[in-house]
Structures are given as structure tokens and as C-alpha cells.
């Protein structure tokens, strides 16, 4: 939010052409553009690129069209082998997993690069398929001697902190793997394609935007695919997976540069299990599947469905916030300006957090915790001993099975404990919050706490206790429709939970039952 940050983003904005239609090509046997060991993307890997480009089109008003590899394109994709023979001499290089540039970028080619004279410089995305195994460790002072007498053109080096150099010798195993198997979503290579596409669309590495200490937390793949860092375990746990989409900060930056695609998934969509998004990064088929994704959605009444998982989860529907899903932590986020209305928890002890809009929050099995926030919300606890805070708005709270606690101090609400010995509280400690509630205790021995306002109460089956908070000078008007003598009881208490001795009261107009 500093002026320097704004200036940095402005420089990016000026360096990128805003385009409605972008074209790309998979490099074929055309004159070599970057690496002398360049190869075309294998056909089954082209499907991976197409899926990633569809995701980019989902968040940005850009349409990508595939064209002939013999034509100029705004984006070009290819593989390269980092182990190269430069001008017939031995060359030992440092390690890079991928390389990318955006269409307007200028720069001096590095030693390995051979420019293609017959094509305009496009945005390029090259992924390294060289693989290596440990060969030996030498002192840094001996590198020239090693290159002269022993080096192989397939060697690569890593500089260590102790003034030594680790030499790895290349093999062809990774190329064979890429040729035989499709890049899996959530793999490092899949993430690398997204990272390099980010560069081609104009993004720097995330740390280049960070100008003060408090923002350094953003330098991790929790927030951005443009980071090289995995998050600290206290901040997130992806279970060894990598981002499957552009992440929270990436989407914010890209939409600042290009604008937002406000036509993406305007219908009612489900993310997770039973997904109808048509995107692998948002779809789960069984409990073994995991996601590391940021959700962008333009409209409709949408749902996060994580109902089949048996682990404890945190589902947060607020934009810019993270959820802990499927045994991972902070692995699902919701992009800014995205509204997701509904959430379905799983079989564990889940926490469901609503947003300012009208939410349907379904807990499922387990002892679940609900926070509604603003909006007129519907809560369904499911089996287990649940705690539901309705908060602002006119809400409907249903505990279902289990010994539940239903709490809602604001608005005109409907609260139903369902089965079990439930506690229902609509009495705030603040005397200035009169309620207008319809309350059903349901089966079981329930405790119902009532305060100021108008309440229509049905205790239901069981031995129920109706606790009335009394405030000096404040009237309340509550009706109990099924009070049973010798079974139910009424208790009058002060705001600090001290029981009032009704025998010392000056006047009692009417009191039903024995107590």
C-alpha cells in the first residue's frame, strides 16, 4: 500500500499490453529460440497447458487461442534440457527449473541462449526436463581444473555455503517420465508452468513487491505462485502439494493489470465434492483427493462441499481468507471480490465461518462450531454436539441430533434444538438488545435462556428449564406454549447469573407450575 509499491505496479501496468485475445503456440521444429536442446511439449502435456490457460482466462478478460507452431504467437511453450554443449565446448551451468518472459520484456540473453532471428520475441515459457544425480563435491577453487580435466557436458553445479561445489551429473530419466506420464495437478512441474505463465503475463517474483518487514509473510506459495518459498508449518501445510491455480495475491495483481473476468461461472456452482465447475483444481472425487487452490467466481449461489472428509476442517467463506480442508491447512482461499454463499462440512469436528451475505452452513457429522456473521443465515448442525452462533441478521438455527448450543442475540430468529439436551440462548448481557424469536426446544431436557424482547417458546418433549434474565425497568413479553406442571420449570436470574428469590418479589402477576 506504499507509494513505492504503487509505482512498481504502475511500471508493470505500462509494460503490458492489455489484450482481449491472446494467442499461444506449442513450439515445434521451428528455428531454435532459446535452448539448443529445445523440444516441443509432448501431446499429453499440452492438455496441462490448456487447462492452466483456461484458469487464467477464468480470472482475466483474456481468451487464449492455439495456433500453428510455425506462426508468431504472444506466448510460446517448450521444453529444454539445461545440460547443453555451447559452441562445441564444455559448459557447466547453474540450475534453473524454468524460464519465461512476457511479450514486451527486453533483456540481454544469457550464455546458453541462442536468439531466433526469424521470429519476433514473444512471451516464452520453457520447462527444464533435465534430471541429475549426485556425482561429487569439490572445493570452489578447483572448479577450473575440474572443467578442464573431468567435466561432462551433462554436469550441473550447486554452490554450497561452506565454499564447496556439489556436482550433479545429468541423465535422461526425467525426459522419459515427461514423455510417458502427464504432469499431475499439484506437482512441482504443474506449479512451475503456472509460475512461468505468471512471468509471461507480467508478474515479477513476489519478493520484488515486498518493501517492508511486515509484508514478508506474503513471500510463500501460500499467497503466490511467484514465490520460491514453502510457507512455515505454522502458517500452512500443503502435504507436499504445490498450488494448482494462481493464488490469492497473484489473482489480485493480475486483475489489477488486466481487469476481472466477470462472466466466469455465473451459474450456481459447487466447489469440492460434487463439483460442476469443470476445473480439476476445484473438483474432488474421493477423500484421497486434495486441493491447493484459490477460488475466483463471478456470480450465482455457490457452495463449498467438503462433506466426505472425515478429518476436522475449518471452512471460511470470507474473501481473502483461508480454509483448512481435507487434512491440510490454509490450502483453499477465496479471491477478493468473490462471494461464496454456502458451505457443507464433513464428518469431523468442523468450524464453519460465514460472510456478510446470506449463508447456508451445514455441519454434517461431528461436533461442529458455526459463526454466521452478518446476513440472514441458515444453520444445520447435523449429528454431534454442535455450537451455533447466529450473530447478525435474521437467522434460522437447527441443532439436529446431539446436545447442541444455539446462541443468537440479534434480529428476529428461529431456533430449534432438535434431538438431545440442548441449550438455547437468546439473552444478551446487553439490556439494549431486545429479541424477536421463535424457539423450539425439541426432544430432550433443554435449557432455554430468554432476555428482553418478544419470544414465542415451545419446550418440546422432556423436562425443560426456562431461564429469564431480568433487567430493572425493562419489560419483556415471552410466551411458553407447552409448559407442563411438575415437569418444566421457570427460573428468574440477574444479568450476572444470580438466581432471583421470587418469594421476595413485590408483585407476581401470574406464575404457572410449582417453581
Model-derived features: positions:
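Parallel beta-helix/beta-solenoid
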Residues: 188, 221, 290, 298-299, ...
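Acidic glycine/aspartate-rich repeat arrays in secreted/surface proteins
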Residues: 71-78, 204-217, 222, 240-243, ...
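Zinc-dependent metalloendopeptidases
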Residues: 1-347, 365
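Glycine-centered beta-turn/loop sites at beta-strand termini
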Residues: 288, 297, 306-308, 345, ...
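Surface-exposed loop/turn motifs in large extracellular/passenger domains
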Residues: 331-334, 431-438
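Extracytoplasmic/periplasmic beta-strand context in beta-sandwich domains
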Residues: 73-75, 123-125, 224, 293, ...
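Surface-exposed or flexible loop/turn and strand-edge residues in extracellular/cell-surface modules
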Residues: 72, 122, 301, 312, ...
Amino acid at each position: 500500500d506504499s507509494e513505492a509499491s504503487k509505482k512498481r505496479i504502475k511500471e508493470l501496468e505500462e509494460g503490458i499490453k492489455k489484450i482481449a485475445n491472446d494467442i499461444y503456440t506449442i513450439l515445434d521444429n521451428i528455428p531454435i529460440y532459446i535452448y539448443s536442446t529445445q523440444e516441443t511439449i509432448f501431446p499429453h502435456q499440452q492438455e496441462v497447458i490448456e487447462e492452466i490457460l483456461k484458469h487464467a482466462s477464468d480470472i482475466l478478460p483474456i481468451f487464449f487461442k492455439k495456433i500453428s507452431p510455425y506462426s508468431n504467437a504472444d506466448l510460446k511453450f517448450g521444453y529444454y534440457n539445461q545440460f547443453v554443449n555451447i559452441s562445441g565446448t564444455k559448459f557447466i551451468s547453474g540450475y534453473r527449473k524454468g524460464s519465461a518472459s512476457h511479450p514486451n520484456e527486453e533483456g540481454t540473453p544469457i550464455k546458453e541462449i541462442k536468439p531466433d532471428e526469424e521470429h519476433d520475441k514473444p512471451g516464452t515459457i520453457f520447462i527444464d526436463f533435465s534430471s541429475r544425480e549426485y556425482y561429487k563435491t569439490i572445493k570452489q577453487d578447483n572448479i577450473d581444473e575440474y572443467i578442464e580435466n573431468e567435466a561432462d557436458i551433462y554436469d550441473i553445479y550447486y554452490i554450497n555455503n561452506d565454499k564447496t561445489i556439489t556436482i550433479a551429473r545429468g541423465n535422461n530419466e526425467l525426459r522419459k517420465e515427461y514423455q510417458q506420464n502427464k504432469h499431475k495437478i499439484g506437482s512441482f512441474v504443474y506449479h512451475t508452468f503456472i509460475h512461468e505463465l505468471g512471468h509471461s503475463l507480467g508478474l515479477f517474483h513476489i519478493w520484488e513487491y515486498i518493501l517492508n518487514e511486515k509484508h514478508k509473510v506474503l513471500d510463500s506459495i501460500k499467497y503466490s505462485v511467484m514465490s520460491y518459498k514453502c510457507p512455515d508449518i505454522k502458517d500452512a501445510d500443503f502435504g507436499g502439494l504445490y498450488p494448482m491455480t494462481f493464488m490469492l495475491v497473484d489473482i489480485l495483481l493480475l486483475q489489477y493489470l488486466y481487469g476481472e473476468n466477470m462472466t466466469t461461472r455465473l451459474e450456481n456452482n459447487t466447489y469440492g465434492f460434487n463439483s460442476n465447475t469443470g476445473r480439476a483444481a476445484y473438483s474432488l472425487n474421493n477423500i484421497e483427493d486434495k486441493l491447493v487452490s484459490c477460488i475466483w467466481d463471478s456470480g450465482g449461489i455457490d457452495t463449498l462441499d467438503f462433506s466426505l472428509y472425515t478429518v476436522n476442517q475449518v471452512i471460511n467463506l470470507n474473501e481473502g481468507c483461508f480454509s483448512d480442508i481435507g487434512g491440510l491447512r490454509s490450502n483453499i482461499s477465496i479471491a477478493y471480490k468473490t462471494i461464496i454463499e454456502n458451505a457443507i462440512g464433513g464428518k469431523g469436528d468442523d468450524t464453519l465461518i460465514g460472510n456478510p451475505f446470506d449463508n447456508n452452513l451445514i455441519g454434517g457429522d461431528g461436533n461442529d462450531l458455526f459463526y454466521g456473521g452478518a446476513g440472514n443465515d441458515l444453520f444445520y448442525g447435523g449429528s454431534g454436539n454442535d455450537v451455533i452462533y447466529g450473530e447478525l441478521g435474521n437467522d434460522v438455527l437447527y441443532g439436529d441430533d446431539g446436545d447442541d448450543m444455539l446462541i443468537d442475540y440479534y434480529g428476529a430468529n428461529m431456533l430449534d434444538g432438535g434431538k438431545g439436551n440442548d441449550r438455547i440462548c437468546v439473552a444478551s448481557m446487553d439490556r439494549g438488545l431486545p429479541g424477536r424469536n421463535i424457539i423450539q426446544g425439541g426432544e430432550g431436557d433443554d435449557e432455554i435462556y430468554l432476555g428482553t424482547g418478544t419470544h414465542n417458546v415451545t419446550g418440546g418433549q422432556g423436562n425443560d428449564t426456562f431461564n429469564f434474565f431480568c433487567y430493572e425497568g425493562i419489560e419483556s413479553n415471552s410466551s411458553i406454549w407447552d409448559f407442563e406442571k411438575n415437569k418444566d420449570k421457570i427460573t428468574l436470574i440477574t444479568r450476572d447469573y444470580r438466581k432471583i428469590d421470587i418469594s421476595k418479589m413485590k408483585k407476581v402477576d401470574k406464575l404457572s407450575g410449582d417453581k
